[in-house]
Amino acid sequence: MYVTFNEALDSSFGNLESPNHDFKVGDPNMVPTPPMDSDSAAISLAFLISLSITFAILMLILVVIAAYVTFCGDDESEYDEENALGTRTSGTLHSLFGKKHSGILLDSSFASPGGFDDEIVLQERELEELPKMSAYEVELYIRAKEFQMMSPPMVKDFGTYLDSDDQQFIKDRGIQSYFLLPSINDNIDEYGNFLPSFIVQDKLDIQFSKFNKSSSTVMNYPLPHNRKDAVYFEVKIFRHIQKSNSIFSIGLTTVPYPYFRVPGMAKYSIAYESTGKLRINNPFTASTLLPKLEEGDTVGFGYRYKTGTIFITHNGKKLMDVTQNIGIDLFIGIGAFNAAYTRTYTRDGLLEDPDNVSFREALSEGKDIEVAKDLQRVHDPHDESDEMTSDEVELHVNLGQVGFVFIEANVKKYAFGSVYGQIGIPPAYNGTEIKKDTILQKGEELPPRYADTDNFFGSMKVKEGSSSRITAQTSKPLWSVGTYERISSNFDRENNVYHDSLETDDNNTDNNVNNNDENAGCNENSPLLEDDGNKRPENSNTPREVSDGAINKNPRNKSTKKRQRNRGKSSKKKNRSRK
């Protein structure tokens, strides 16, 4: 075996050294060729293909995640001015990729009041809270409870409240179709005169008057579906003095809602109170979770269709998501009440409020507690001598007819709809089209000239006398008939010659007046025939001036002319006889 192997090795080296080969064993540049594997190319190609497929799948997953976060995630940044703990919305993808909420997310007790349905729990709460209230607060609580027993709230699925006619009207008119309901005739004086608790101006502007004790109003239509992610509205506080005795609430309610109760204090209602309290179906003590509202602030409420979430904004910043899974028709609700009639918001109630830490600290340190004069004690609204006038509050509602303070609502178009609907803008009455009218422009360039006198005929005063005689007295001498004719008639002015200096016969005047009938007297006594310059009598029958060639048909005038002619003839005869 060993010999055979050596022989084979020698023969191999001998073949390498033979002249038939291009290289020799001693050649230093000789590199042995490795054996070629026929499957290596196929293996490398398969590896590259698998690697590209893996990267493609990863890219596809990233694109899907990015698309979901962009279009299905939260639309705006979250703010937390109260330093509250944040939570995440439900759902696997939301938990993994959703944005982290910095606001407070409450349960869905808004749609399911909970404690109100349990009579035992409600009775225990009433026994605890009602003694802390004033008589007027207890009265309002009982009235609201009876009201909702007689008229239960309409808890319908979102978008089912409106009929086809209302939907078409909203499409046609847009935001112009929405308005706040007017005040109920609740407050009257001893004479039966209506004392409105509030006045609605321009459909969406509300002003609570000094007669207000406790009242509220709602919108005529519920929140619409604007084909966007959410719907949003804002309320601007135009008037609310500091240390006011009026407290107002802004929120969402169902209908019918007690008109004498502010939002948030009855079933199926949520409200942002001006004191900073957040009320959800809570007529009792509420927690202060929000900033206090002052004049100039803007409060916003939004509703997300997909998750049924209600969120609140303050001066353009989102505060929190209040509740979720709300799928019913909601109406905008605004109300106000006089805090002087309550114990909760007067001195004693404020000291018992656990959120008023500063009051208790000041009281423990012996410092004076600054409370408004009207809120030092509880007043009785049923006692006329103890009634308090409410401080006026003015609020303006913005449904999208102007820009929102909340920027994201403008970008995402969360308005209630178009401003003018499908009908469009009404005709313009600002004068832009009228200015193009040539005739009207000419009329503006050449305005008509009016007389400086008191009326059309001058400063004329008429005194009534007997039926047969009417006298006229004027501050200025009237024109004669000839002067009047020359002014009034172009034809007479151009073709006739007038003589205004004719003399009158005073003796014939009085006789002629007695002989004429009433009609003749009235015609001859016209103010136009009176000429103070010639000193004519009132009822003078002197002949009128006539043009050249005109014939005077008055017989008296003819007799006068004959006498003048006879006098002329007699004078001529005398002259001849003298000669």
Swiss-Prot record:
Which residues are modified by glycosylation?
N212, N356, N430, N507, N557, N575
**What PANTHER family would the database entry show?**
RAN BINDING PROTEIN 9-RELATED (PTHR12864)
Show the cross-link location (Glycyl lysine isopeptide (Lys-Gly) (interchain with G-Cter in ubiquitin)): K367
Positions where Phosphoserine occurs in the chain: S358
The miscellaneous annotation reads: Present with 450 molecules/cell in log phase SD medium.
Low complexity: bias regions: 509-525
Q: Which GO terms describe its cellular component?
A: endoplasmic reticulum; endosome membrane; fungal-type vacuole; vacuolar membrane
Please explain the role this protein plays, according to its UniProt record: Components of the endosome-vacuole trafficking pathway that regulates nutrient transport. May be involved in processes which determine whether plasma membrane proteins are degraded or routed to the plasma membrane. Confers leflunomide resistance when overexpressed.
Gene Ontology molecular function terms on file: ubiquitin-like ligase-substrate adaptor activity
Entry annotated with the keyword Nucleotide-binding? no
Give TM segment ranges: 45-65
Disulfide bonds, which pairs?
A: none
The region called Disordered is annotated at 499-579
Please name the source species: Saccharomyces cerevisiae (strain ATCC 204508 / S288c) (Baker's yeast)
**PROSITE patterns found in the cross-reference section:** B302_SPRY
The UniProt family comment states:
Belongs to the SSH4 family.
- Topological domain ranges for the Cytoplasmic compartment: 1-44
What domain of life does the native source organism fall in? Eukaryota
Answer whether the UniProt record assigns the keyword Cytoplasm to this protein.
Answer: no
Tell me the GO BP annotations in alphabetical order: protein transport to vacuole involved in ubiquitin-dependent protein catabolic process via the multivesicular body sorting pathway; vesicle-mediated transport
Where, in residue ranges, is this chain on the Lumenal side?
66-579
**How the protein sits in the membrane?**
Single-pass type II membrane protein
Give the Basic residues compositional bias ranges. Answer: 555-579
For this entry, the protein name equals Protein SSH4
Q: Where in the cell is it found?
A: Vacuole membrane; Endosome membrane
| Keywords attached to this entry | Endosome, Glycoprotein, Isopeptide bond, Membrane, Phosphoprotein, Protein transport, Signal-anchor, Transmembrane, Transmembrane helix, Transport, Ubl conjugation, Vacuole
